[in-house]
C-alpha cells in the first residue's frame, strides 16, 4: 500500500505527484483496472496470445 506523508513546506500538489508516482511504480492502478471486472481464464489467455502476436510483427 502506497503511503505518502506531506513534508514541511511542501505543497499538496507536490505530495500528490509523489503519491501518484509511487502508485505507478507499484503498479497499483494497473492492478485495479485489471481486476475491475472478472475475466475468464480462457479470455485472459486469448488476450495474452494476441498481445504476443502483435509484439512479434
From Swiss-Prot:
Keywords: Ribonucleoprotein, Ribosomal protein. Pfam families: Ribosomal_S21 (PF01165). It comes from the Bacteria. Gene3D superfamilies: Ribosomal protein S8. Residues 31-57 are annotated as: Disordered. The keyword Repeat does not apply. The keyword Ribosomal protein applies. Signal peptide: none annotated. One of its GO terms (molecular function) is structural constituent of ribosome. One of its GO terms (biological process) is translation. Residues 33-57 have a biased composition (Basic residues). GO terms for cellular component: ribonucleoprotein complex; ribosome. Belongs to the bacterial ribosomal protein bS21 family. NCBIfam families: S21p. This is Small ribosomal subunit protein bS21. The gene is rpsU.
